[in-house]
Amino acid sequence: MNNEETFYQAMRRQGVTRRSFLKYCSLAATSLGLGAGMAPKIAWALENKPRIPVVWIHGLECTCCTESFIRSAHPLAKDVILSLISLDYDDTLMAAAGTQAEEVFEDIITQYNGKYILAVEGNPPLGEQGMFCISSGRPFIEKLKRAAAGASAIIAWGTCASWGCVQAARPNPTQATPIDKVITDKPIIKVPGCPPIPDVMSAIITYMVTFDRLPDVDRMGRPLMFYGQRIHDKCYRRAHFDAGEFVQSWDDDAARKGYCLYKMGCKGPTTYNACSSTRWNDGVSFPIQSGHGCLGCAENGFWDRGSFYSRVVDIPQMGTHSTADTVGLTALGVVAAAVGVHAVASAVDQRRRHNQQPTETEHQPGNEDKQA
């Protein structure tokens, strides 16, 4: 692959200047949370490494992951597709169709055996021998296994591929199955969400291209750089949660004031994703900022956890399990206790200082002799 076109060469061929290329590397480093100091390393990698071939296949899904990906802003999806990677097969985005598209698929997995990244959107249904999802005239499960056999790594796009999503909701008549339950001998990184945040998708690809490895993941296989914290942890309404200020109905005064949406069913306290920090639509907003609670779409089994508008009963708060009704009072109690302790300590310190202070008589000249 040494004679193949690199990312930098592809960008220069498209008329991108050196200055713009370095700016791109700086933005990529920032979006990955690596800091500006990593920009030179990203630049070196993209100047010297050939573009990675990517095969993107679709199982049971609604194509929302693709729709999200093409709206990426940092980096732009067009830069990822046309320059950063070599997206050789994606039956949604490619011009070829039918037999011609399948010939491309076979050529890529044969020519780049062991070198390409497999991106999977959707999941395989195992019921009725896989006949609930047909691709190229045969069950999708067969295509998935064939593509996975020669892949260097696999990306599970979205909640469908990661957990099963709505297709796997009870009673799961098609036996829709997450891909890690079917492919067990390959490294798989899960990027859940319905859909995932577009900038998260493109940033993960940038990381893999730059460092030739998967990003660090949690015990469930999600990249820590984007799924290491709950939406609740960085939510701008968090202060209202801690103060016990909650919206009680969609049209009340608390809703107009932007109070916490936890009582309206917001799943932010139990959902790990980057919505509250990265946001959507080029960082413009996210559901909670738009006035609607988080649905928890990045979590496993979110379709089977009751109504989207029923709140979580208990969540950890300040070392105890407090409900939304009591957490505000608890916070106020802690503050009141702290104020009380401070007041008592101040009074004791003041009395101690008063007892140690010499009297006015003791400081008068000659008093030492009189006392003697």
Swiss-Prot record:
One of its GO terms (cellular component) is membrane. The chain crosses the membrane at residues 326-348. Residues 349-372 are cytoplasmic. Exported by the Tat system. The position of the signal peptide cleavage has been experimentally proven. It is a single-pass type I membrane protein. The gene is hyaA. This is one of three E.coli hydrogenases synthesized in response to different physiological conditions. HYD1 is believed to have a role in hydrogen cycling during fermentative growth. This is Hydrogenase-1 small chain. It catalyses: H2 + A = AH2. Heterodimer of a large and a small subunit. Keywords: 3Fe-4S, 4Fe-4S, Cell inner membrane, Cell membrane, Iron, Iron-sulfur, Membrane, Metal-binding, Oxidoreductase, Signal, Transmembrane, Transmembrane helix. The keyword S-adenosyl-L-methionine does not apply. Binds 2 [4Fe-4S] clusters. [4Fe-4S] cluster 1 binds at C62, C65, C160, C194. [4Fe-4S] cluster 2 binds at H232, C235, C260, C266. It is found in: Cell inner membrane. [3Fe-4S] cluster binds at C275, C294, C297. Residues 347-372 are annotated as: Disordered. Residues 46-325 are periplasmic. Its EC number is 1.12.99.6. Residues 360-372 have a biased composition (Basic and acidic residues). Belongs to the [NiFe]/[NiFeSe] hydrogenase small subunit family. It comes from Escherichia coli (strain K12). Residues 1-45 form the signal peptide.
